[in-house]
Amino acid sequence: MQANELKLAAGEGQGSEPLIFKPLGIDTWQEHVIYLHPDCPVCRAEGFTAQARVQVRIGEASLIATLNLVGAPLLDTGEASLSASAAQALEARAGDVVAISHAPALESVRALRAKIYGRRLDGAQIDSIISDISAGRYPDVYISAFLAACADGRMNRRETVDLTRAMVHSGERLSWSHAVVADKHCVGGLPGNRTTPIVVAIAAAGGLVLPKTSSRAITSPAGTADTMETLTRVALSAAELRHVVERVGASLVWGGALNLSPADDILIRVERALDIDSDAQLVASILSKKVAAGSTHILIDVPVGPTAKVREDRDLERLEAAMRHVAGAFGLHILMVRTDGTQPLGRGIGPALEARDILAVLQRTVAAPPDLRERSVMLAGALLEFCGAAPRGAGEKAAGQLLDSGAAWRKFQAICEAQGGLRVPGEAIFRRDIVAPHAGKVIAIDNRHIARTAKLAGAPMRQVAGLEMRVRVNDEVRAGQPLFTVHAQASGELDYSCSYALAHPAVSIEPH
């Protein structure tokens, strides 16, 4: 819609000149923001100030955005701009007429305040909050407050069930004709550990149906969707997903493109910035996606270690109890598998580097990390048994045979081809080794420092960034031997990451 096509006044449509959209190319990472000049007549007439929540309309499309004020030369008084996500949502073009008005009051904020003060919420209150979040009515500061108010055990099991249900209702829900629809998920917290694509390929080669949808990274250097995106197309529609699964029996796609529990993707974006992931949010995030995807049998991998997300067995027991309670409310069958979370799994940490590990394992090359292969075969075997595709006690052997025969690799190729084609992951421009300060034995590797180093290098936003592990616990090293190699796409990020790595040693070496 161009300015000369419609003389629509801002606000209530009386007495103000229309605002004309001017693209500025500002990326706020999915947060809707509108930019106006401080002396804009609409601001003066309506009393708008910076950080006000306003309703923005272009034609028939509208959304709620946060107001930022910017002056000349970026904007004149009769111009308005939008963040990239808001412009995309409104399909805005240069010259479009923009109308703004006061945003409607949000009744759910009362429930949010109650939760901040430690009160229990009922299902209707939680549903109202999630409904407003998924509709884009909450600014990030409100979402942050909700996440913080629910963290550290502040949400009980009944609330967690209600949260999960509200998140399922916030989007679409898939259904399948198969009695058993398998899935595999890892709670995260362990750098590398990209077993899911390998497990899906093995299990699908063994006859299971796995419409696998994955999230992007929350607090880690890569999520399964981030990693798979370096290999194939992951943003599929529901119709495309169904076609892929009907054709090859499995998928490896990003759940965010399917409108499955869309509130979860918004929460994940803010959780990533806060670097938090509470039990209640973790359970609701995982299980809402599984319910929405139509899964019936879910294997959940839980790495346990002193620097993993789940640090002790008692934490695992608490998480498993919550998972089983919520899963039972939705008729889901779950199998929790405790795995070693004392050190990173595989060599690559970061989307492209982890993708290379996946290819090496599936192609059975000499470069395949043995630990990643072993863990993947064990989990795939457990899933085959859990879903009745292998006799009890015979799953791991069956999984190993499916991998060694090349059946899993052929299935993975088929999945990627069905999703748009298989491509080779890229490589970073800059690399630098972090070396051992002295000779000795590696006695520990700090997962959190490793993950932080990889993220400072640019992962997961820069697909080729991250780090490559050169040692494992119990390895003997000499002075000056590389412990890991940092990969970055910008020299500044390389320096930043390496400075952190040197100031916060991730690899503990006991001198001889």
Swiss-Prot record:
- Which parts form a coiled-coil structure per UniProt? none
Q: Which Gene3D superfamilies match?
A: 1.20.970.50, Nucleoside phosphorylase/phosphoribosyltransferase catalytic domain, Pyrimidine nucleoside phosphorylase-like, C-terminal domain
| EC number in record | 2.4.2.4
**Which Gene Ontology terms of cellular component type are present?**
cytosol
Q: Which Pfam families match?
A: Glycos_trans_3N, Glycos_transf_3, PYNP_C
Reactions listed under catalytic activity: thymidine + phosphate = 2-deoxy-alpha-D-ribose 1-phosphate + thymine
What does the UniProt keyword field contain?
Answer: Glycosyltransferase, Transferase
Q: Would you kindly state one Gene Ontology biological process term found in this protein's UniProt entry?
A: pyrimidine nucleoside metabolic process
Identify the domain of life. Bacteria
Q: Which InterPro entries does the annotation name?
A: Glycosyl_Trfase_fam3, Glycosyl_Trfase_fam3_N_dom, Glycosyl_Trfase_fam3_N_dom_sf, Nuc_phospho_transferase, PYNP-like_C_sf, PYNP_C, Pyrmidine_PPase_CS, Thym_Pase_Put
The record's section on PROSITE patterns has: THYMID_PHOSPHORYLASE
Alphabetically, the GO molecular function entries are: 1,4-alpha-oligoglucan phosphorylase activity; thymidine phosphorylase activity
Please state what class of enzyme this protein is: transferase
Checking HAMAP family in the record gives: Thymid_phosp_2 (MF_00703)
NCBIfam families, A to Z: ARCH_P_rylase (TIGR02645), PRK04350.1 (NF003338)
Q: Which family does it belong to?
A: Belongs to the thymidine/pyrimidine-nucleoside phosphorylase family. Type 2 subfamily.
Write the protein's name: Putative thymidine phosphorylase 2
Phylogenetic placement of the source organism: Bacteria, Pseudomonadati, Pseudomonadota, Betaproteobacteria, Burkholderiales
